[in-house]
Amino acid sequence: MLGNAMVEACPAEGDAPVPITPAGRPRSGQRSYPDRLDVGLLRTAGVCVLASVMAHVDVTVVSVAQRTFVADFGSTQAVVAWTMTGYMLALATVIPTAGWAADRFGTRRLFMGSVLAFTLGSLLCAVAPNILLLIIFRVVQGFGGGMLTPVSFAILAREAGPKRLGRVMAVVGIPMLLGPVGGPILGGWLIGAYGWRWIFLVNLPVGLSALVLAAIVFPRDRPAASENFDYMGLLLLSPGLATFLFGVSSSPARGTMADRHVLIPAITGLALIAAFVAHSWYRTEHPLIDMRLFQNRAVAQANMTMTVLSLGLFGSFLLLPSYLQQVLHQSPMQSGVHIIPQGLGAMLAMPIAGAMMDRRGPAKIVLVGIMLIAAGLGTFAFGVARQADYLPILPTGLAIMGMGMGCSMMPLSGAAVQTLAPHQIARGSTLISVNQQVGGSIGTALMSVLLTYQFNHSEIIATAKKVALTPESGAGRGAAVDPSSLPRQTNFAAQLLHDLSHAYAVVFVIATALVVSTLIPAAFLPKQQASHRRAPLLSA
């Protein structure tokens, strides 16, 4: 397991005192960690950030390019949406294998292989001659990108140790949160200046740089002894997650979750996932994802909190730029600029949150973060309901929401592994990555369905959509709707604005309620810092 790799890995610093037992004897085989964030650790964090930001920015950049794909390939929005869905399904398929692969091949080699796969996928996407090949190459990207987050986190957890984990996650989290904010700006500029292919070509120098730096900076870790791979677990979980998320992601196009094209794959996926849970719980050796980690109270509460929080948070992420573009008539680049307060709020809060987590444990700071997210999202919903201009309500809500993200997301990830033994960290980080992905995917689909439901119950919006789909409007080819093509009736534009704002406000309020409900599992997170107490360690 990863224990061999972690225990035998080259230390970043060798001058720290050797840990001793209560009887005063050094603990043989254990690694010592300095209290400060040394240069070696910061270099390792920098390489992890470089690769992770590349993958995170790519997601937001591709979302900005959806209309451009429709126009250039002469396709439909339903087909083009698979450039996002295919990537998501690839993530769901590969993330469960990250823990085993880290143990089997070593985190250093797995990280470099993941960066290489993502970079090659980017090159293939850039030269794709049609929409079908673009979707296929996005899946290749997803196979590489799916490994990056859990493997990067395992590397950082190994190099930082429990006493420095909160601070190093704060250092890493700032650029990772700012990256997606800059994605729409970068994407809008590249598409306008050079064309959509450059949103993929820009990944090549970044990916190659991360590959070279990883080879230089990362310490060599020894893969664990060969173990029996859990093929049955893989055959149950990966298709289960992919099938379930396929069904859920199909719901916005169907307008309801009650459609058979949604229910059949979703129920099939849930059945496969349930079978995997039973298989993993009773498999005595090397399960793909060790569900027995949930016997650790800190792991269970952190994963439950992350899943519920992702439901409300990631669904609202999808709708923020959509609202700014559709209702406030902003361009993709403008909407990206106007979401910057969210990133600035996270940047302000994250260093404080990391230091507090190291001193006091994750519970209090996560609770504060969730309350801030709810307050910020509620403020934004209030501005939307009032049909307010961007200033001053909307940026205020975004900034408060960003501060909450800075106080909650990284501490939750840290809480999921902070009480685990070294050989369990890769499996623990894989577990919370899977739950975050599943929660975010369900939340995104849920918010899209709710918004579609609100749109379908407005005659004004239905009329506007019919106009937008006519060839004369240009919207079917990815262009904006010509206001002169709207029906010439009294106050039609004002009524359309009212109905659009009401639809978005309802969805944002529901997202806020989901975030508030996260306070329940978060209240049971560990109240103490990890070095002061250790949860019972499970055999792996």
UniProtKB/Swiss-Prot annotation:
GO terms (BP aspect): transmembrane transport
UniProt xrefs under InterPro entries: EmrB-like, MFS, MFS_dom, MFS_trans_sf
Mode of membrane association: Multi-pass membrane protein
Cellular compartments per GO CC: extracellular region; plasma membrane
GO MF: transmembrane transporter activity
Alphabetic keyword roster: Cell membrane, Membrane, Transmembrane, Transmembrane helix, Transport
Taxonomy, superkingdom: Bacteria
Subcellular location: Cell membrane
PROSITE patterns noted in UniProt: MFS (PS50850)
Residues spanning the membrane: 45-65, 78-98, 117-137, 171-191, 198-218, 229-249, 262-282, 304-324, 337-357, 365-385, 390-410, 431-451, 505-525
Record family assignment: Belongs to the major facilitator superfamily. EmrB family.
Protein name as annotated: Multidrug resistance protein B homolog
Species the sequence originates in: Mycobacterium tuberculosis (strain ATCC 25618 / H37Rv)
Lineage: Bacteria, Bacillati, Actinomycetota, Actinomycetes, Mycobacteriales
